[in-house]
Amino acid sequence: MAYEAGKIEKKWQKIWQEKEYFEPKDDFSLPKKYILSMFPYPSGRIHMGHVRNYSIGDAMARYYRKKGFNVLHPIGFDSFGMPAENAAIKHGIHPKKWTYENIDYMQNELASLGFSFSKKRMLATSDPLYTKFEQEFFIKMYEKGLIYTKEAEVNWCENDKTVLANEQVEDGKCWRCGHEVIRKKMPGYYVKITAYADELLQDLKKLEGKWPSQVLTMQENWIGKSTGLSFDFDIEENNKISAKKINVFTTRAETIYGVSYIALAPDHEIVNELIDKKLLDQDVIAKIQNIQNQTPRQRQAAPKEGYFLNLYVIHPLSKEKIPLWVANFVLSDYGSGAVMSVPAHDERDYEFAKTYNLAIKKVIYKDENDAQCYTLKEGVLTSSGEFDQLECNDAREKISLKIESLGIGKKVTNFKIRDWGVSRQRYWGAPIPMIKCDSCGIVPQKIENLPITLPEDVVINGEGNPLDKHETWKECICPKCGKKAQKESDTLDTFFESSWYFARFASDDKTWQEKAVDEKSVNYWMNVDEYIGGIEHAILHLLYARFFQKALRDLGYLKDDEPFNRLLTQGMVTKDGAKMSKSKGNVVDPDYIIEKYGADSARLFILFAAPPAKELEWNDSALEGAFKFINRLYEKAMSLECGKLQEIDHQSLNKEEKYARLKVYEALKKSFEVYEESFAFNTLIAACMEALNALNAINHKEVSKEAFYIILNILEPIIPHVCFELSEYLFKCENFKVLKIKDEVFIKDSFNIAISVNGKKRAQIEINSEAKEDEILALAKENVAKWLEGKTIVKEIYIDKKLVNLVVK
């Protein structure tokens, strides 16, 4: 009988759905596994990256179900976002219609791959019910002071006409559309993620060994904790500006005597005052304003650029005059937006000083080091007044104490991470549940009025925010004073939705209407045991999700400190050496692959071609190879007799039969480690292939039947359709359970021993495992007889089952 992938796969997909095989059980006494792959944006079609992500998660989920665990393996759609609006402009279709049609299509695609997702817990973040509880969280966070409003410089994408968080700007471009990003001052809502900066940093220790070290390092660097000294420089008396002092922050207080200039951020208040009063040359003002329009990343990537501001400050200890500059490498949102620049001991300061011919003052020496820029925190101070000859660490402490005693500074801790701006000037997003009242100011909506949903009668043409122009939708009554007011027209950053979806999935779907999260269910399922997704989410989604977990914990919704126990970051799928994309013309359509080869072949190839964390290069011939392997597996299985297994007397088997059985049980042993620890599915598949090759060399019915009983069990999480089909035919699926290792299979009948003469290896022999030492020595001498001729054996050394060494003279 020929292997018909399409027929077999449709049959089993129907059976699994009808039997609700993928739904989690209500029995909370069972051991649980919560396995979650990052949910997709409903773009309209799944791509091979999705296939890889979900094949990995599905293999884990199926394995643990078979092991008797209660498994939660949900899927949903991150369904708000700008592409829906862009589609509305391009194709004249409403974002809602476009989104939900795409969801329907993609659900069918995912089902056709046999992914074992819970259908009852499927959600879309644009569903009104999801919006309702998200808005509830927003209001609770606002009331707790975790969300606030302010006017600030923001990243603005001219193409998408919306604000972007710092994390959403990549190399000066919008992460979504790739358009240049500019800086713009706007009011907006901010999530106070900085309130949790220290906990977010400290709790990374809990994830060591469970998350990739690269992700932990990226988050640690993004949070950017630094402890140092914050202190003031007096501004030399002048009639130009109102400020009298400039505050700076440094982690290198020991270099204070090496300051040769103070550098201000381009948008520092002193710089803006000089521009407003036109106290700088017009061409300088134009150049500074150009820098102000650049994003922080654009500024840092650009060549060092700066301008003297015709002002001086007074050094707090040496009382020297120090020039005041504006520089593009100083960021306004780190420290106070002012840097004490020490060119002799900081490479960036040195580069700027060399460019503009500024003084370079060495104040640290080590071993007569004459480097122009010495950056190590080791050595002794020089040209530092009363602190000369002190070691760096000692000097840092004593200078800090001196500054504190003068009342002009103190030790502080700074973080690089900034509060998360979540206001977006777009239509297709969750409305921010706030009201603007002329009498009361900003007021939250009443919880009982949620959800605040989007109007559908909007014109989407790419010109501003449609909600801002929808007067009837904006009109409302202030819940505080009862007067006419207006709804907030901004919508939430879509990362707000993806920051808590894992908790929603963990809630009992029977309580979804009443509660954001169901306490009993969430306490059982959380936290996520295995989380699978791309490393590109290391800072954005994963950091926001960790913050949300902690914030919702403190609001009483959740109990755990961290949302994801283990994280697996899968590599991207490439073709012709590049990431798959329509623009490169190297996209592989999963629908075509399923149609031609079947879902199991696609899954087998994707898990065999590379370890999950590595890049996977698409290879048509390897896919063909996966298809042929399944065909051979099918043909061999169909040639076997059905029925129960018979006991096998291992000792009665010949050498080839014992070897085949050993290979099968080695694969079984490996399966436990792969599915539970390493996820190196490629090595497990290779072990199964090796076992099947060994089976082809024998003709023992019971050994072959036992082998398939085990191999179909091992491969079911990877190629489920064909394994169910063959297991039903051969064993009525009784093999889908936890299988035990049989120790007798691993007992060797013989072993190899190296034979050396005077320490030099001369031969290797195979010895029966029951042979005695004198028999082994006799056989050894026989095999190296030519090296013993004319010699006397003075010593015989035998190391059990490893080595014989004959010492002769």
Curated annotation (Swiss-Prot):
The gene is leuS. GO terms for molecular function: aminoacyl-tRNA deacylase activity; ATP binding; leucine-tRNA ligase activity. InterPro entries: aa-tRNA-synth_I_CS (IPR001412), aa-tRNA-synth_Ia (IPR002300), Leu-tRNA-ligase (IPR002302), Leu_tRNA-synth_edit (IPR025709), M/V/L/I-tRNA-synth_anticd-bd (IPR013155), Methionyl/Leucyl_tRNA_Synth (IPR015413), Rossmann-like_a/b/a_fold (IPR014729), tRNAsynth_Ia_anticodon-bd (IPR009080). A motif ('HIGH' region) lies at residues 40-50. Belongs to the class-I aminoacyl-tRNA synthetase family. Its main location: cytoplasm. It catalyses: tRNA(Leu) + L-leucine + ATP = L-leucyl-tRNA(Leu) + AMP + diphosphate. ATP binds at K582. This is Leucine--tRNA ligase. CDD domains: Anticodon_Ia_Leu_BEm, LeuRS_core. NCBIfam families: leuS_bact. It holds the Pfam family tRNA-synt_1. GO terms for cellular component: cytosol. A motif ('KMSKS' region) lies at residues 579-583. It is found in: Cytoplasm.
